[in-house]
């Protein structure tokens, strides 16, 4: 498990350090720093982790998702031979204010339903909260640098996968975004 933070002052850093210390048998590391890869801060932050990863599988997950213990199993469960990427729209939970409630209403009604319907029709598209890749697919399309050529990495991910004749699939259960 590779955790990435752009700055040591990131609010998640103390939690990640505690998790690593509490689970010494799990191979994990925290990488801090920013590489100017593109105009996308998320990709700039993830680049060091992408370079450090040695697995054939890569999962890019936003830090504001609540992940169940079977997160990776759920992503793998929908993988097929013609899959290039597995993603999942988030479910908005626990809004703290009016604008949080608006975000939850959007995520949990229009956005999630359209995305799930598209997936059922074989036209699934990525949501940047969860991007589960086979490394060879991402690298064949130009790697993280290719994702940075578009404003949104999820749109670029969908295009990269489809350009290779592969499909984006969605996890069968969504993940909470408080």
Descriptions of predicted regions:
Residues 18-51, 55, 70-141, 145:
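Long helical/loop segments within the catalytic core of UDP-sugar-dependent glycosyltransferases
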């Amino acid at each position: 498990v590779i955790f990435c933070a752009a700055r040591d002052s990131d609010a998640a850093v103390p939690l990640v350090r505690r998790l690593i210390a509490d689970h010494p048998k799990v191979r994990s590391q925290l990488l801090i720093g920013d590489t100017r890869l593109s105009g996308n801060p998320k990709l700039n932050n993830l680049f060091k982790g992408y370079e450090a990863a040695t697995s054939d599988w890569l999962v890019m997950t936003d830090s504001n998702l609540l992940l169940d213990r079977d997160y990776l199993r759920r992503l793998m469960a929908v993988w097929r031979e013609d899959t290039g990427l597995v993603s999942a729209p988030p479910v908005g939970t626990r809004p703290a204010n009016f604008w949080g409630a608006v975000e939850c209403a959007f995520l949990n009604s229009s956005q999630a339903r359209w995305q799930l319907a598209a997936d059922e029709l074989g036209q699934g598209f990525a949501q940047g909260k969860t991007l589960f890749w086979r490394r060879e697919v991402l690298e064949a399309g130009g790697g993280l640098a290719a994702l940075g050529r578009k404003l949104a990495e999820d749109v670029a991910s969908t295009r990269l996968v489809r350009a290779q004749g592969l499909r984006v699939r969605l996890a069968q259960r969504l993940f909470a975004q408080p």
